[in-house]
Amino acid sequence: MARVIDKEEKRCDIALSAITLFCEKGIQQTSIDQIAKSAGVAKGTIYLYFKNKEEIVFTIWDILTQQHEEVFYKRINPNMSAKEKILEYYNFSECQEGFDKEQTLILFQHFVSSMLIDKTSLYTDYFESFFKKDYDFITKYLYEGIENGEFVIDDVELLTNSIIMLLKGALIKAKASNMGFDEAQQILTKHITYLLEQCTRKVL
């Protein structure tokens, strides 16, 4: 008997089938017809699961984000410092498992590009909520570092926003310099480490 696929699983399958298209053609240049063909479904079926192409894009990112968070919480432990936890949060090495890591980098770059030219506020609103999660996470562990005597920070909000801006800048730098995933990851880790060391003072 054929396996029953629930609606959410089918929705995820359709969204994930669009990754290669988005990476090769770009989000703006990819049509619903092409996504339907890639997913092996009729165009009308796409609209049973998604209102528009943007929902497909956001579903992909929700899937990647959920996977990243699950892996992160498995990797950390109570003995890790706040600095180590922040660096681990921005370690995207699990992209090698289940997803093509180079495609993941290209996809994120396309996401940011779409946000920059967005006139509908759909991308802007989505990524605002996405970076808000990053903000809350970084702030949590910076204060944890303060409380456990790991370091002293003059301005937690400024440091938090600087780390988030660094992530965006690293994506643009990777694109401009034609970096692969591994090199981009090394650059991101190096600069976040430097930023944390320069903007925190160890408690004496």
Please tell me what each predicted stretch does.
Residues 69, 74, 119-148, 157-161, ...:
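Amphipathic alpha-helical packing segments from all-alpha helical-bundle domains
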Residues 1-25, 29-41, 55:
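Basic, helix-initiating cap at the start of DNA-binding domains
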Residues 40-50:
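Short hydrophobic/aromatic patch on the recognition helix
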Residues 24-27, 48, 77, 148:
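Helix-turn-helix/winged-helix DNA-binding modules
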Residues 85, 98-122, 172:
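Amphipathic alpha-helical segments used for helix-helix packing
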Residues 59, 73-103, 159-163, 185-189, ...:
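Hydrophobic alpha-helical connector segments
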Residues 95-99, 140, 144, 160-182, ...:
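Amphipathic C-terminal alpha-helical segment
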Residues 8-16, 28-29, 49-73, 87, ...:
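An amphipathic alpha-helix adjacent to DNA-recognition modules
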